[in-house]
Each structure stands twice: as structure tokens, then as C-alpha cells.
Amino acid sequence: STQMLSPPERPREFRHPNELRQYLKELNEYYAIMGRTRF
């Protein structure tokens, strides 16, 4: 099944540096995957 990935949800506020880091990591992975699968 081809499933459209959606970008990670951005928290309204980042309470901890780790939250921001985790979000950026997921965002990075999302764009890496999206950039690779161009048809």
C-alpha cells in the first residue's frame, strides 16, 4: 500500500531542547524519504 507520509507534527512550543532536537531529526528523516521517492 502506498501511503503518503505526512511531516512530523510540530509542537506548539518546545519545552525542552530534546523536543526540538527530536522534531528536527524526524523532519530531516521525512524530507530524506520524500526527496528519495520522486516519480
From Swiss-Prot:
Family the entry assigns: Belongs to the NPY family.
Organism: Cornu aspersum (Brown garden snail)
Compartments in which it is found: Secreted
Chain coiled-coil ranges: none
Expression by tissue: Neuronal somata and fibers.
Lineage, uppermost ranks: Eukaryota, Metazoa, Spiralia, Lophotrochozoa, Mollusca
Sequence positions bearing Phenylalanine amide: 39
GO term, biological process aspect, one: neuropeptide signaling pathway
CC annotations in GO: extracellular region
Keywords assigned by UniProt, alphabetized: Amidation, Neuropeptide, Secreted
PROSITE patterns: PANCREATIC_HORMONE_1, PANCREATIC_HORMONE_2
A Pfam family recorded for this sequence: Hormone_3
SMART domains: PAH (SM00309)
Main subcellular location: secreted
Organism superkingdom: Eukaryota
Recorded GO MF terms: hormone activity
Family matches, as InterPro entries: Pancreatic_hormone-like, Pancreatic_hormone-like_CS
Record protein name field: Neuropeptide F
Chain's role: May have an important physiological role in neuroregulation.
